[in-house]
């Protein structure tokens, strides 16, 4: 499997995005956000929805050749779905939950990205024909422990959130340039604009923060730990007292 850099993946996403803009559905029109369904059409894939696990920990599956996938019916009985190599299978409960639209869109693009990378590097991906996306695999930490998942995550992020659409959305959402500190408790105005931007682009706040951080549009990301600012102030006060 090739170990692509972020720069390599950005170049791939730019090529795919250029082709997307030429589709008749969006050609010569103002694009506000990426449609995962239209992106699937571009790369010759289709989508189906099934219940993929009993506890919701598996949200997407795809493969490059025929493969039987275990799914669950409405009575929680195991059945099998036959993937044909051109299908992205996404969890039905995730699809039906409108509050999870951003997570759903990213899942679709993650599975699509596996297929795009396989098509670009067929000899490298022949040994790995089956992909399952777990929530716990949305991991961007270093060192990279799973290059296949990291590359799919990175390409999905770049495809779903092109730089020009983020800048355009920032303007529409009243964000004036780079967000120096993303913090919902202590920088509420910027955070409100950021939240509106995530909704506008159809993505989760987590995915958007990671993408904007990479693009240099966010300085400090306190999305998960908003009280970190208070802790920093306390540390500085303690240091001052100790001197």
Language-model-derived ranges and their functions:
Residues 1-243:
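Active-site hotspot residues in diverse enzymes, especially metal/ion-binding acidic/histidine motifs
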């Amino acid at each position: 499997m090739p170990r692509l850099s972020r720069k390599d993946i950005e170049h791939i996403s730019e090529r795919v995005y250029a082709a997307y803009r030429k589709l008749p559905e969006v050609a010569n029109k103002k694009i506000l956000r990426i449609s995962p369904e239209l992106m699937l059409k571009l790369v010759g894939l289709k989508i189906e929805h099934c219940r993929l696990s009993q506890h919701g920990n598996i949200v997407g599956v795809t493969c490059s050749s025929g493969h039987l996938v275990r799914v669950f019916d409405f009575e929680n009985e195991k059945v099998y779905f036959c993937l044909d190599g051109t299908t992205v299978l996404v969890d039905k409960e995730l699809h039906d939950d409108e509050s999870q639209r951003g997570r759903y869109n990213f899942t679709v693009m993650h599975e699509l990205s596996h297929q795009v990378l396989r098509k670009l590097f067929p000899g490298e991906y022949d040994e790995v024909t089956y992909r399952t996306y777990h929530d716990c695999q949305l991991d961007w930490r270093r060192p990279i422990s799973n290059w296949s998942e990291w590359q799919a995550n990175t390409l999905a992020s770049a495809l779903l959130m092109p730089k020009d659409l983020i800048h355009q959305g920032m303007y529409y959402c009243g964000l004036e340039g780079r967000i120096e500190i993303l913090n919902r408790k202590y920088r509420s105005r910027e955070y409100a604009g950021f939240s509106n931007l995530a909704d506008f682009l159809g993505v989760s706040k987590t995915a958007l923060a990671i993408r904007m951080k990479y693009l240099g549009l966010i300085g400090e990301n306190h999305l998960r730990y908003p009280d970190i600012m208070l802790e920093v102030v306390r540390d500085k006060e303690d240091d001052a007292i100790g001197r």
